[in-house]
Swiss-Prot record:
Single GO MF annotation: O-acetyltransferase activity
Further details from the record: Contains 2 motifs that are conserved in esterases, but it is unlikely that this protein belongs to the catalytically active pectin esterases.
Organism: Arabidopsis thaliana (Mouse-ear cress)
Domain of life of the native organism: Eukaryota
Function of the protein: May act as a bridging protein that binds pectin and other cell wall polysaccharides. Probably involved in maintaining esterification of pectins. May be involved in the specific O-acetylation of cell wall polymers.
Name this protein carries in UniProt: Protein trichome birefringence-like 37
UniProt-annotated location(s): Membrane
Motif mapping: GDS motif: 138-140
Length: 385
């Protein structure tokens, strides 16, 4: 009797384990994300060379280190270069050339709370990316970052021969000895603006114009946001918005940005080969026109000489940054978010202000040398870790 009971108990245990195992497999099958066959093959190739895990976690942190949580500290070793010796800076970013009297804003480095950022080495960057193509795609903040990286590399290898072509929409800088080319593709909305019978139409569902130029790069750094806030047909560059079959004069700009960025995400998923190309999103660069955000009502970036202390911005987060995070989370392609928003919000002192050469007050872009050098240092760290 005892033998029969023990046998029955053993059979019941095996049956329960079989059922649970089958349920686990079914659940795993249901939760498995959809990945195209091409990207399955590409991801397998990346994993095979030890990079898959790093790329797949790229939306969050790098090697357990949050590069973007920290504070600004005074650093006498900064800046990385002298603007007067860099031939690639546009006047609108060359604040010292146009008379900015203070230089303390150049002497701050970003210190993450949980790790140390490796110092940028332009020659090491060129050697690692020898024969490669790097492209920044976006608006004038992409221009800001592109020129910064060009100057940072140039300061490390000042005697190397370069080929510099600046055109619209595609510019390039090639470091000939290393066969490394930095491209800039200017497209403020990422999605298309087309000429139709009614006028210029911002098409939230289309990326066709020029997007072939983005393909087959080794590193892509995308950016978009500032132009989505522009109003008035001259400033915004379009007359109508097309959303599916609807054609309208205007719509909620955050909603439009969300739809346009979703279209961009779909383009990346369909066209980027992750075994060849690493993809970054530059993150949302803030402005400093409203001093109430940092408890100085009626102030702007004009006359600001020091960054905010601490690691949080009094004005809080930006809704556009949440949209970027949401869109990236829905994509199959691993896109690393270069989450520069908060650390840039703390730098109310780093804008051209009245020293951009055009007579206005610019609290949108950034002086060079300056904050975009830190963006590139963090890009360098993310690529190195």
């Amino acid at each position: 009797m005892g033998f029969k009971l023990n046998s029955l108990f053993l059979l019941l245990s095996l049956l329960i384990l079989t059922i649970l195992s089958g349920a686990d497999q079914a659940l795993a099958y249901v939760k498995k994300p959809h990945v195209s066959q091409r990207n399955k093959t590409a991801l397998a190739a990346v994993a095979g060379r030890g990079g898959g895990k790093e790329m797949l976690k790229g939306r969050k942190q790098t090697s357990g280190c949050n590069l973007f949580q920290g504070r600004w500290v005074f650093d006498a070793s900064y800046p990385f270069y002298d603007s007067s010796t860099c031939p690639f800076i546009d006047g609108e970013f060359d604040c010292l050339k146009f008379g900015r009297p203070d230089k303390q804003f150049l002497k701050y480095s970003w210190q993450p709370d949980s790790c140390t950022v490796p110092r940028f080495d332009g020659e090491a960057f060129l050697k690692k990316w020898r024969g490669k193509r790097v492209m920044f795609v976006g608006d004038s903040l992409s221009l800001n970052m592109w020129e910064s990286l060009a100057c940072m590399i140039h300061s490390s290898v000042p005697n190397t021969k370069t080929t510099f072509l600046k055109r619209t929409p595609l510019s390039s800088l090639t470091f000939q000895e290393y066969d490394v080319t930095l491209f800039l593709y200017r497209t403020p909305y990422l999605v298309d603006i087309s000429k139709e019978s009614v006028g210029r139409v911002l098409n939230l569902g289309a990326i066709e114009d020029g997007a072939d130029a983005w393909k087959n790069m080794d590193l892509l750094v995308f950016n978009s946001w500032h132009w989505w806030t522009h109003t008035g047909v001259q400033s915004q560059g379009w007359d109508f918005i097309r959303d599916g079959s609807s054609l309208m004069r205007d719509m909620d700009r955050l909603d439009a940005f969300n739809k346009g960025l979703t279209t961009w995400g779909q383009w990346v998923d369909q066209n980027v080969n992750v075994s060849q190309t690493r993809v970054f999103f530059q993150g949302i660069s803030p402005t400093h026109y409203m001093g109430r955000e940092w408890n100085e009502p009626r102030k702007t970036c004009n006359g600001q000489m020091q960054p905010l202390t601490g690691s949080t911005y009094p004005g809080g987060s930006l809704p556009a940054a949440s949209i970027v995070s949401r869109v990236l989370s829905t994509m199959r392609t691993p896109v690393y978010l270069l989450d520069i928003t908060t650390l840039s919000q703390l730098r109310k002192d780093a804008h051209p202000s009245t020293y951009g050469g055009d007579g206005g007050t610019d609290c949108s872009h950034w002086c060079l040398p300056g904050l975009p050098d830190t963006w590139n240092q963090l890009l360098y760290a993310a690529l190195s870790m």
